[in-house]
Amino acid sequence: MPASGHNPQYSLGSTDAEHERLIWQSSRIAPLTERLFREAGIGPGQRVLDLGSGVGDVAMLVARLVGPSGEVVGVERDTHSIARARARVAESGQRNVSFTESDVNQIANDTPFDAAVGRFILEFLPDPLAALRSVSRLLRPGGVLAFHEPCYAPFLLLSAHLPLWSASVSLIHQTLLRSGANTEIGLDLHRIFLEAGLPGPAMRMEILLDSDPDFTRWTHDLLRSLGPQIQQQNLSLEPLGDFATLPERLQAEVAASKTVVPFVALVGAWSHKPIDQVPL
């Protein structure tokens, strides 16, 4: 459960600006997610469930892996996000992706899935263990569960040498914590899989490092999306100075240090539903 003990909520909202941030973010981490899914065994002809689809990036990635003979069903509870996801899929020409508006614990399904995937979804759920159990019931015996979730501890540690960058990522972290997100859920996936009745997952942690302006812009844009929650959680952007110039000041700090800065650590975990468990 989240360290704060509150019920988690998606703290980043569903504005057009947040959608653009998600699309950019996905473009940077897509190779890591694709490698995870390939290693998990997701491939041509499979029927795959994508949890918390957002604006559709993971669903479209999986659609390429399963090919025209496969199918991807994305589940998302936010109407605005689903509309954007559907528009993007239509524009891409992919015909093997559909989206349904639903809570992840209330998915209706008559045909078992071959796999269930998700990225940055379990961290925001009030009971990720219950969600994993629920989703597992929708899979065929031997089906794959593969998730990409965050671990903020290395993100904070590797930012400590830069005062402004450290203050910025610490504010992101504190806002998510107070909103109820489990910011270290990546390292908790082993326990969650086991308690869900699944074999211990194969796991890996990866951290992207860079120093380009787009990377520092990501921090600014994440703080912008968190703005309402920052205020609601009695935190403040004021210690960071003029918010409009934050990207330039962050980039100047990184350049002056002649070092790189991290993206949040990504923990990938995947396992198979036991053969003797039949779908419900």
PLM segments and residue spans:
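N-terminal, positively charged/glycine-rich alpha-helical extensions of SAM-dependent methyltransferases
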Residues: 1-19, 24
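C-terminal helical/coil "lid" or tail adjacent to the Rossmann-like core of SAM-dependent
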Residues: 11, 15-18, 200-261
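Conserved alpha-helix/loop element of class I SAM-dependent methyltransferases that forms part
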Residues: 27-46, 61
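Class I SAM-dependent methyltransferase SAM/SAH-binding core
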Residues: 49, 55-106
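A short acidic, Gly/Pro-enriched loop at the edge of an enzyme's catalytic core
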Residues: 106-115
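A short SAM/SAH-binding and catalytic strip from SAM-dependent methyltransferases
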Residues: 114-128
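A short glycine-rich, Lys/Arg-flanked "PGG" loop and its adjoining helix->strand segment in the class I
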Residues: 129-144
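Conserved catalytic/acceptor-binding region of the Class I
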Residues: 146-214, 229-232
